[in-house]
Regions:
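Short, conserved beta-strand segments within well-ordered enzyme catalytic domains
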Residues: 20-22, 67-69, 96
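Short, low-complexity, polar/charged sequence segments that are solvent-exposed and flexible
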Residues: 22-25, 40-42, 85-88, 115-117, ...
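Short hydrophobic/aromatic-rich motifs at helix boundaries and adjacent loops
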Residues: 25, 55-57
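Conserved glycine-rich "GG(E/T)P / GGGxP" loop and the immediately following alpha-helix
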Residues: 62-87, 127, 131-139
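Canonical Radical SAM [4Fe-4S] cluster-binding loop centered on the CxxxCxxC motif
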Residues: 11-48
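Histidine- and/or cysteine-centered catalytic micro-motif in compact active-site loops
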Residues: 24-26, 69-73, 100
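Canonical radical SAM enzyme core domain
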Residues: 41-55, 74-115
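Auxiliary Fe-S-binding modules of radical SAM enzymes
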Residues: 2-15, 58-62, 91-153
Length: 153
């Protein structure tokens, strides 16, 4: 699997200590110049097996969730599916998906994800000059008013 980033421990993107996996593709629906993840476009690709990612997670006693984030995890749908299916074999911990898509744009994918609970999705494109707001589900501030998270399963 190709990823752009692996953070074994993150304490800022979710209310629980999390491993963050940065997926390598994006359709630039927000506009490349607006993307808060644009530095990842020039980051080198990391070629790592799904099993190695899961092993890193399982061997870390600090993390309690996995975050699949940007660039855009839904633009690497097959890899995301494979990761989730394999992760669920080993762990029932929460999987948080950070997406710039709106809920309506990924309805079919949400239906598939419901079988792999617990899954949380943070929806919404980045919009500049918005007031940050606290999201109860994630337990953090989100940067744009249109962004929100929900537990889908």
């Amino acid at each position: 699997m190709i990823v752009k980033e692996i953070r074994d421990e993150d304490f800022t993107s979710y209310k629980k200590p999390s491993m963050v996996i940065g997926f390598p593709r994006c359709s630039w629906k927000c506009g490349k110049g607006l993307c808060q993840n644009s530095p990842l476009t020039t980051a080198p690709n990391i070629d790592i097996s799904i099993n190695s990612l899961i092993e890193r997670y399982m061997n870390n006693p600090i993390t309690n969730a996995v975050i699949c984030a940007g660039l855009e995890p839904f633009d690497s749908w097959e890899d995301l599916q494979c990761f989730i299916m394999n992760f669920r074999y080993w762990s029932g911990d929460e999987i948080v998906l950070y997406t710039g898509y709106n809920k309506e744009e990924i309805k079919d994918k949400i239906e598939w994800l419901k079988f792999y609970e617990p899954i949380i999705i943070k929806y919404g494109r980045f919009i500049p000059n918005q007031q940050p707001h606290y999201d109860e589900v994630l337990g953090i501030n989100l940067i744009s008013d249109n962004q929100y998270a929900e537990v889908i399963s």
